[in-house]
């Protein structure tokens, strides 16, 4: 099943590989048109790319998205009015219950004041790009590096591949309503793509997180698109 993140990844590939703007926009249009009947999926693509160059490109490539963007704004406005009229105190997405890592603080600060929901994709991409730049391409190197910067790592080489991180610094002493270790997930994805010599795009999803009360963080990796 195609999700918004997979579409965004394919759009990024088009952006990076198509040299001429006309060809780039046509390829993006053809891709987005495939999902024209799934408005909620396209809305999610718009939300996750908000504030980026890619966002502007896809609006140019596929003008019908402008109407969906208006719908998103109207929906957000209604939610805001409902919240204000209800007089409920606005809750933080993530709260701290003790000393947290600098990255955890920066992430929540950017979410609250600047990035909103976009923080998820941005920190995922940062982690992924960092791993790719480091050139980590073996499980042993991945475990060694993550032990220093994230936490204790156990890799279950099953299908799908599962990575368990204990005492993850990204979420230690954090409390949230959903998994929040986007940087860790992206980093794992980058390492695994290196291990496949970038033959596949790898998607990593955090299914358990200490921030929501789980005993450890669990990440599941899946190869989503073959590139060769």
From Swiss-Prot:
It comes from the Archaea. Transmembrane segments: none annotated. It holds the Pfam family V4R. PANTHER family: ARSR FAMILY TRANSCRIPTIONAL REGULATOR, DNA-DIRECTED RNA POLYMERASE SUBUNIT I. This is Uncharacterized protein MJ0855. It comes from Methanocaldococcus jannaschii (strain ATCC 43067 / DSM 2661 / JAL-1 / JCM 10045 / NBRC 100440).
């Amino acid at each position: 099943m195609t999700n918004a993140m997979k579409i965004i990844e394919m759009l990024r590939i088009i952006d990076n590989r198509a040299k001429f703007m006309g060809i780039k926009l046509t390829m993006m249009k053809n891709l987005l048109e495939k999902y024209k009947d799934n408005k909620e999926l396209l809305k999610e693509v718009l939300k996750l790319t908000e504030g980026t160059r890619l966002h502007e490109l896809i609006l140019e490539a596929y003008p019908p998205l402008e109407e969906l963007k208006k719908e998103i704004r109207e929906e957000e406005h209604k939610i805001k009015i409902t919240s204000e009229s209800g007089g409920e105190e606005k809750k933080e997405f993530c709260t701290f219950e003790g000393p947290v890592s600098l990255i955890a603080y920066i992430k929540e600060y950017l979410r609250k004041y600047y990035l909103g929901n976009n923080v998820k994709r941005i920190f995922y991409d940062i982690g992924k790009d960092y791993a790719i730049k480091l050139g980590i391409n073996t499980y042993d190197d991945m475990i060694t590096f993550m032990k220093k910067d994230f936490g204790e790592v156990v890799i279950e080489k099953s299908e799908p591949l599962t990575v368990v991180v204990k005492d993850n610094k990204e979420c230690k002493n954090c409390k949230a309503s959903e998994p929040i270790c986007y940087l860790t997930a992206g980093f794992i994805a980058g390492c695994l793509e290196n291990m496949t010599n970038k033959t596949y795009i790898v998607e990593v999803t955090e299914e358990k997180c200490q921030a929501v009360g789980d005993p450890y963080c669990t990440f599941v990796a899946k190869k989503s698109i073959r590139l060769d």
